[in-house]
Structure formats: structure tokens, C-alpha cells
């Protein structure tokens, strides 16, 4: 049973997330030869204040 965890910044629409998990599930099924019911995907959203790139909060980089 593959389990995939995806970390992403908040703000994506429900439709974008549906498309992401659908396409990821398809890719996992074809590459690992499993059925969709075996694939688990965890989406973890975070705010720009909780993410850093190069020592700078992402929320500060957008300014």
C-alpha cells in the first residue's frame, strides 16, 4: 500500500487538489502495478508563514 505525503502552500482550490490526487494515483498505479484503492495520499497544507526558503520565510519573499 503506497502512502504519499505532499506538502504544499495553502491556497489551491478543491478542483486543483482533486486533479493532483487523481493524476498522482494514476502515476503510482502504472509505475507500481497497484490498484487505485491501495494508494493513499496525504495533502498537508501550510501557510507562507510556516515555510522557509534559504532562511527567509516564504511570506516575506512574496513582498
Residue ranges and their predicted role:
Residues 2-63:
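A domain-level signal for the structural core that forms small-molecule/cofactor-binding pockets
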Amino acid at each position: 500500500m503506497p502512502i504519499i505525503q505532499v506538502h504544499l502552500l495553502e491556497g489551491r482550490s478543491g478542483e486543483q487538489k482533486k486533479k493532483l490526487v487523481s493524476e498522482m494515483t494514476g502515476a503510482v498505479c502504472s509505475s507500481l502495478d497497484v490498484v487505485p484503492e491501495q494508494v493513499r495520499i496525504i495533502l498537508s497544507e501550510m501557510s507562507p508563514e510556516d515555510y522557509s526558503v534559504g532562511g527567509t520565510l516564504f511570506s516575506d519573499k512574496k513582498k
